Amino acid sequence: MGQKVSPTGLRVGVIKTWDSRWYAEKQEYVKWLHQDIKIRKALMKELKGASVSKIEIERTKKEIVIFIRTARVGVVLGQEGKNIAKLVKLVHITIGDRKMEVKINVVEIKNPDTDAQLVANTIAEQIVNRASFRSVQKLAIKKAMKAGAQGIKTSVSGRLGGVDMARTEGYTKGTVPLATLRSDIDFALAEALTTYGQIGVKVWICKGEILSKELVSTSDEKPKFEKRDFNRSNNNRRDQAPKSHPVAKEAK
């Protein structure tokens, strides 16, 4: 069976960057990695209703900079930004180091209908609320295409509708080239915990192609090549008159 690689992992280092950006030695690497996992879990739990798509972390030995990408900036900031101090305190408790300097930057997602994580979370929430999994997917696809996406693909799997046997159903609209590395594919997973069991939700959204300036400038130019007439030698042979064969002289 063919195995499908993660579209995000395939493009990291090509057109996408890492969610955690730092360098550490062997002893600190494991410690910082576990801290990043705990920080993300704690912040996602605290900001459950704030439509948070992604949390990126940059750090040095003395400082941690956290970027929270959300569609609801006001909910994350709170009144006059009071919620930021609460989140900084939560990070200090999570990592167990109050001396570490923590900075939190909130980044607004201007088009939430084309963000794969937010779309997947919306589908999962509506499935939990007993909405039809087919109509929920169709509505999400309609909104994404209207918002400017070039293509979208959705998939839900599990005991859909409470049936005994689990199955997978999904829809696709537009172009979603998963094997083209220059295409910007946003991929996300979400889980819906229903009374019948767990239902998985996957969303792929194509936002177009990302090309470097060099590739864009040279792509319009037509390649130069020399025209060669491979039949020239054969034509010359045809035009030439056939050589007369020498006639053997009769012996007297």
UniProtKB/Swiss-Prot annotation:
Q: Which UniProt keywords apply?
A: Ribonucleoprotein, Ribosomal protein, RNA-binding, rRNA-binding
Q: Does the record bear Lyase in its keywords? A: no
Stored SUPFAM superfamilies: Prokaryotic type KH domain (KH-domain type II), Ribosomal protein S3 C-terminal domain
Offer a single GO CC term for the protein: cytosolic small ribosomal subunit
This protein's source sits in the domain of life called Bacteria
Q: Which family does it belong to?
A: Belongs to the universal ribosomal protein uS3 family.
Matching entries from HAMAP family are given as: Ribosomal_uS3_B
UniProt function note: Binds the lower part of the 30S subunit head. Binds mRNA in the 70S ribosome, positioning it for translation.
Under what name is this protein listed? Answer: Small ribosomal subunit protein uS3
Native source species: Spiroplasma citri
